[in-house]
From Swiss-Prot:
GO biological process terms held by the UniProt record: mRNA processing; regulation of gene expression; rRNA processing; tRNA processing
Cofactors demanded by this protein: Mg(2+)
Identification of the protein by name: Ribonuclease 3
Main location: cytoplasm
Catalytic reaction list: Endonucleolytic cleavage to 5'-phosphomonoester
Amino acid sequence: MNPILINKLQRKLGYTFTHSELLQQALTHRSASSKHNERLEFLGDSILSYVIANALYHRFPRVDEGDMSRMRATLVRGNTLAEMAREFDLGECLRLGPGELKSGGFRRESILADTVEALIGGVFLDSDIQTVEKLILDWYQTRLDEISPGDKQKDPKTRLQEYLQGRHLPLPSYLVVQVRGEAHDQEFTIHCQVSGMAEPVVGVGSSRRKAEQAAAEQALIKLGLE
Protein backbone atom coordinates (compact mmCIF):
# COMPACT_ATOMS: atom_id res chain seq x y z
CA MET A 1 0.00 0.00 0.00
CA ASN A 2 1.22 3.51 -0.81
CA PRO A 3 1.95 5.06 2.62
CA ILE A 4 1.25 8.60 1.39
CA LEU A 5 -2.20 7.64 0.10
CA ILE A 6 -2.93 5.58 3.22
CA ASN A 7 -2.01 8.45 5.55
CA LYS A 8 -4.15 10.80 3.46
CA LEU A 9 -7.07 8.35 3.68
CA GLN A 10 -6.77 8.00 7.45
CA ARG A 11 -6.79 11.79 7.83
CA LYS A 12 -9.97 11.99 5.76
CA LEU A 13 -11.56 9.16 7.73
CA GLY A 14 -10.66 10.87 11.00
CA TYR A 15 -9.17 7.65 12.33
CA THR A 16 -5.68 6.11 12.42
CA PHE A 17 -5.51 2.33 12.66
CA THR A 18 -3.42 0.77 15.42
CA HIS A 19 -3.40 -2.54 13.54
CA SER A 20 -2.54 -1.65 9.95
CA GLU A 21 -3.37 -5.17 8.76
CA LEU A 22 -7.05 -4.46 9.48
CA LEU A 23 -6.94 -1.40 7.25
CA GLN A 24 -5.20 -3.38 4.52
CA GLN A 25 -7.80 -6.13 4.71
CA ALA A 26 -10.67 -3.61 4.63
CA LEU A 27 -9.27 -2.17 1.40
CA THR A 28 -8.76 -5.57 -0.26
CA HIS A 29 -11.33 -6.79 -2.79
CA ARG A 30 -11.77 -10.53 -3.19
CA SER A 31 -10.29 -10.29 -6.70
CA ALA A 32 -6.93 -9.30 -5.18
CA SER A 33 -6.42 -11.79 -2.35
CA SER A 34 -7.97 -14.66 -0.42
CA LYS A 35 -7.67 -12.43 2.66
CA HIS A 36 -10.29 -9.97 1.45
CA ASN A 37 -12.76 -7.61 3.09
CA GLU A 38 -16.09 -9.46 2.88
CA ARG A 39 -16.20 -10.59 6.52
CA LEU A 40 -15.35 -7.06 7.66
CA GLU A 41 -18.07 -5.77 5.32
CA PHE A 42 -20.60 -8.11 6.96
CA LEU A 43 -19.63 -6.79 10.39
CA GLY A 44 -19.58 -3.15 9.31
CA ASP A 45 -23.00 -3.41 7.66
CA SER A 46 -24.58 -4.50 10.96
CA ILE A 47 -22.75 -1.85 12.99
CA LEU A 48 -23.73 0.92 10.56
CA SER A 49 -27.38 -0.14 10.65
CA TYR A 50 -27.38 -0.08 14.47
CA VAL A 51 -25.65 3.31 14.75
CA ILE A 52 -27.95 5.01 12.24
CA ALA A 53 -31.08 3.40 13.73
CA ASN A 54 -30.06 4.57 17.20
CA ALA A 55 -29.36 8.10 15.96
CA LEU A 56 -32.72 8.33 14.17
CA TYR A 57 -34.58 6.93 17.19
CA HIS A 58 -33.26 9.71 19.41
CA ARG A 59 -33.46 12.51 16.82
CA PHE A 60 -37.08 11.79 15.85
CA PRO A 61 -38.98 10.80 19.02
CA ARG A 62 -42.42 11.23 17.38
CA VAL A 63 -41.72 9.52 14.05
CA ASP A 64 -43.13 6.04 13.46
CA GLU A 65 -41.22 2.88 12.59
CA GLY A 66 -42.06 3.05 8.87
CA ASP A 67 -40.60 6.52 8.37
CA MET A 68 -37.54 5.70 10.49
CA SER A 69 -36.93 2.56 8.41
CA ARG A 70 -37.15 4.57 5.19
CA MET A 71 -34.77 7.24 6.52
CA ARG A 72 -32.30 4.57 7.60
CA ALA A 73 -32.53 2.90 4.18
CA THR A 74 -31.73 6.24 2.53
CA LEU A 75 -28.71 6.80 4.76
CA VAL A 76 -27.18 3.32 4.45
CA ARG A 77 -27.99 2.51 0.82
CA GLY A 78 -25.21 1.80 -1.63
CA ASN A 79 -25.14 5.10 -3.48
CA THR A 80 -24.94 7.06 -0.20
CA LEU A 81 -21.98 4.94 0.91
CA ALA A 82 -20.36 5.29 -2.52
CA GLU A 83 -20.73 9.09 -2.25
CA MET A 84 -18.92 8.97 1.09
CA ALA A 85 -16.21 6.76 -0.43
CA ARG A 86 -15.63 9.36 -3.13
CA GLU A 87 -15.44 12.09 -0.47
CA PHE A 88 -12.68 10.02 1.17
CA ASP A 89 -10.94 9.43 -2.23
CA LEU A 90 -11.21 5.77 -1.33
CA GLY A 91 -10.88 4.47 -4.88
CA GLU A 92 -7.19 5.31 -5.10
CA CYS A 93 -6.45 3.10 -2.06
CA LEU A 94 -8.34 -0.05 -3.09
CA ARG A 95 -6.49 -3.33 -3.62
CA LEU A 96 -8.06 -4.91 -6.70
CA GLY A 97 -7.17 -7.84 -8.93
CA PRO A 98 -5.99 -7.19 -12.51
CA GLY A 99 -9.44 -7.80 -14.02
CA GLU A 100 -11.18 -5.37 -11.67
CA LEU A 101 -8.47 -2.76 -12.20
CA LYS A 102 -8.86 -3.04 -15.96
CA SER A 103 -12.65 -2.73 -15.79
CA GLY A 104 -12.51 0.35 -13.54
CA GLY A 105 -13.48 -1.38 -10.29
CA PHE A 106 -12.06 1.52 -8.29
CA ARG A 107 -14.99 3.60 -9.60
CA ARG A 108 -17.69 0.96 -9.20
CA GLU A 109 -20.35 2.01 -6.68
CA SER A 110 -20.87 -1.46 -5.23
CA ILE A 111 -17.15 -1.92 -4.51
CA LEU A 112 -16.84 1.56 -2.99
CA ALA A 113 -19.92 1.05 -0.80
CA ASP A 114 -18.79 -2.39 0.37
CA THR A 115 -15.37 -0.99 1.28
CA VAL A 116 -16.88 1.73 3.47
CA GLU A 117 -18.74 -0.99 5.39
CA ALA A 118 -15.52 -3.02 5.64
CA LEU A 119 -13.70 0.02 7.05
CA ILE A 120 -16.41 0.36 9.70
CA GLY A 121 -15.91 -3.29 10.63
CA GLY A 122 -12.16 -2.76 10.71
CA VAL A 123 -12.38 0.30 12.95
CA PHE A 124 -14.63 -1.61 15.37
CA LEU A 125 -12.13 -4.49 15.66
CA ASP A 126 -9.26 -2.01 15.96
CA SER A 127 -10.98 -0.03 18.74
CA ASP A 128 -14.44 -0.44 20.32
CA ILE A 129 -18.12 0.26 19.69
CA GLN A 130 -18.00 3.74 21.25
CA THR A 131 -15.16 4.82 18.96
CA VAL A 132 -16.73 3.49 15.78
CA GLU A 133 -20.14 4.96 16.70
CA LYS A 134 -18.62 8.43 17.18
CA LEU A 135 -16.75 8.10 13.89
CA ILE A 136 -19.87 7.09 11.95
CA LEU A 137 -21.85 9.96 13.45
CA ASP A 138 -19.06 12.36 12.45
CA TRP A 139 -19.19 11.04 8.88
CA TYR A 140 -22.97 11.33 8.81
CA GLN A 141 -23.43 14.62 10.64
CA THR A 142 -24.54 16.67 7.63
CA ARG A 143 -26.72 13.90 6.21
CA LEU A 144 -28.41 13.35 9.58
CA ASP A 145 -29.00 17.09 9.94
CA GLU A 146 -30.58 17.29 6.48
CA ILE A 147 -32.77 14.19 6.48
CA SER A 148 -36.45 14.36 7.39
CA PRO A 149 -39.39 11.92 7.40
CA GLY A 150 -41.83 11.90 4.52
CA ASP A 151 -42.45 10.62 1.02
CA LYS A 152 -38.93 11.46 -0.16
CA GLN A 153 -37.60 8.62 2.00
CA LYS A 154 -39.56 6.02 0.03
CA ASP A 155 -37.30 3.98 -2.22
CA PRO A 156 -36.89 5.27 -5.79
CA LYS A 157 -38.93 2.47 -7.44
CA THR A 158 -41.90 3.17 -5.15
CA ARG A 159 -41.69 6.93 -5.73
CA LEU A 160 -41.46 6.51 -9.50
CA GLN A 161 -44.40 4.10 -9.55
CA GLU A 162 -46.55 6.42 -7.40
CA TYR A 163 -45.66 9.40 -9.60
CA LEU A 164 -46.71 7.57 -12.78
CA GLN A 165 -49.86 6.09 -11.22
CA GLY A 166 -50.88 9.55 -10.01
CA ARG A 167 -50.79 10.73 -13.63
CA HIS A 168 -52.49 7.59 -15.03
CA LEU A 169 -49.36 6.67 -16.99
CA PRO A 170 -48.06 3.13 -17.65
CA LEU A 171 -45.77 1.65 -15.03
CA PRO A 172 -42.03 1.63 -15.85
CA SER A 173 -40.44 -1.46 -17.34
CA TYR A 174 -37.07 -2.80 -16.15
CA LEU A 175 -34.84 -4.87 -18.41
CA VAL A 176 -31.55 -6.56 -17.51
CA VAL A 177 -29.17 -5.70 -20.37
CA GLN A 178 -25.89 -6.94 -18.89
CA VAL A 179 -24.58 -9.11 -16.05
CA ARG A 180 -20.83 -8.97 -15.41
CA GLY A 181 -18.58 -10.85 -13.02
CA GLU A 182 -18.67 -14.19 -11.26
CA ALA A 183 -21.63 -15.45 -9.22
CA HIS A 184 -20.21 -14.15 -5.93
CA ASP A 185 -19.45 -10.67 -7.27
CA GLN A 186 -21.82 -9.70 -10.06
CA GLU A 187 -22.69 -6.32 -11.50
CA PHE A 188 -26.12 -5.86 -13.09
CA THR A 189 -26.98 -3.19 -15.66
CA ILE A 190 -30.68 -2.34 -15.99
CA HIS A 191 -32.55 -0.23 -18.54
CA CYS A 192 -35.67 1.45 -17.18
CA GLN A 193 -38.17 2.64 -19.79
CA VAL A 194 -40.52 5.38 -18.60
CA SER A 195 -43.49 6.72 -20.55
CA GLY A 196 -42.60 10.04 -22.16
CA MET A 197 -38.83 9.46 -22.13
CA ALA A 198 -37.23 8.94 -25.54
CA GLU A 199 -34.41 6.80 -24.16
CA PRO A 200 -34.27 4.36 -21.25
CA VAL A 201 -32.35 5.38 -18.15
CA VAL A 202 -29.57 3.14 -16.88
CA GLY A 203 -28.91 1.75 -13.42
CA VAL A 204 -26.01 -0.38 -12.21
CA GLY A 205 -25.83 -2.38 -8.98
CA SER A 206 -24.48 -5.48 -7.28
CA SER A 207 -27.93 -7.14 -7.51
CA ARG A 208 -30.87 -6.84 -9.88
CA ARG A 209 -32.89 -5.07 -7.17
CA LYS A 210 -30.15 -2.51 -6.49
CA ALA A 211 -29.68 -1.86 -10.20
CA GLU A 212 -33.44 -1.32 -10.64
CA GLN A 213 -33.43 1.13 -7.71
CA ALA A 214 -30.49 2.98 -9.26
CA ALA A 215 -32.29 3.18 -12.62
CA ALA A 216 -35.48 4.44 -10.95
CA GLU A 217 -33.45 7.11 -9.18
CA GLN A 218 -32.02 8.27 -12.51
CA ALA A 219 -35.57 8.45 -13.88
CA LEU A 220 -36.65 10.61 -10.92
CA ILE A 221 -33.70 12.93 -11.58
CA LYS A 222 -34.72 13.28 -15.24
CA LEU A 223 -38.28 14.03 -14.15
CA GLY A 224 -36.99 16.74 -11.81
CA LEU A 225 -38.14 14.90 -8.68
CA GLU A 226 -34.71 14.51 -7.04
